[in-house]
Amino acid sequence: MEIDVKLTASPKAKPQDESNLGFGKRFTDHMFIMEYEGGKGWVNPRIEPYHRLSLDPASSVFHYAQEIFEGLKAYRADDGRILMFRSRDNCRRLNRSAERMCMPPIDVEFNYGCLLYTSPSPRDKRQSRMPSYA
């Protein structure tokens, strides 16, 4: 599966004090989006600049919503590396939750690769290529 990557033209200012980020207050410059189509599964994966979402008032999410939340926090170690605690396991937990909610599973390895791609590197430089998974 290929992924379309569009990086932001105006990155957010980096926090002055990375040791005091808090939770749910700072967000990345990008977001990972993928749709589900019956008979095809998860399709159209892409990374886009962070933006607001627009929803039709008739969207079924407002009337028959199912949701899964799997929080994951990344932080910078003293040596400059970005650390995430068991992020691949986080993708697996998402699938266990999806099964319980009768929702379609994600491809763990593909989504893990997207997670690594959207996470900042020690000097905010992205890899030159996005991993591709069949």
Regions found by a protein language model. Give the residues of each.
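Short, Gly/Pro- and small/polar-rich lid/capping loops
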Residues: M1-I47
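Short, hydrophobic/aliphatic alpha-helical segments
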Residues: V43-A58
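Residues forming anionic-ligand binding surfaces in small-molecule and nucleic-acid pockets
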Residues: G71-Y75, I82-M101
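Hydrophobic alpha-helical hairpins/lids featuring a short glycine-rich hinge
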Residues: M103-N111
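Conserved small/polar residues in nucleotide/adenosyl-binding loops
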Residues: Y117-D124
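Hydrophobic alpha-helical segments, chiefly the membrane-spanning helices
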Residues: S128-A134
